Amino acid sequence: MKNEIRAVRRVAAPLIAGSLMAASAPALAQDSPPPPKLEFAFEEIVTLGQAIPVGKTPLGTRNIIPITGGTFEGPGIKGTIIPGGWDWQLQRSDGCTHIKADYMLRTDDGVVINVINAGALCPPGEGSAPPRTQAVFEAPEGKYGWLNRTAFIGTLELAANAPGPAVRIRFYKAM
């Protein structure tokens, strides 16, 4: 019986896939959508603690940077960054640093939102892009539910006027 089911699956899967592709061909043949545009969403000033060196791993040299707080503000959203998040940084052999931060925001009206922000920072030079990140937000449905359904690109730089180590991240909605 199991062999018969496997045989049916081997035959049925390509047929189903082909049918789906044929059915969607007219939609794919239409004009391509316009390229995305970016719209400013909000800016964060993220304060950082002292790096905790993990050491050399098979993937590169790992450091953990504590996120100690900060603020954020943009049209319709404002609040503080809850201390206790982390930025896991991996220094790669090509000189670039892969970052992946996981932290929480608290809006002025008390809503807590999770942020996972990742990107690569490469030394300036030929073929290097400016620091960009891609953020994913997890917010309760309601006033800030739009964060769950939007693609975000971030810019990253040192926050020059901060009282201690900090970065400025500007998030843009891809429209």
Residue ranges and their predicted role:
Residues K2-L15:
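Bacterial N-terminal signal peptides that target proteins for export
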Residues A13-A23:
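Bacterial N-terminal signal peptides
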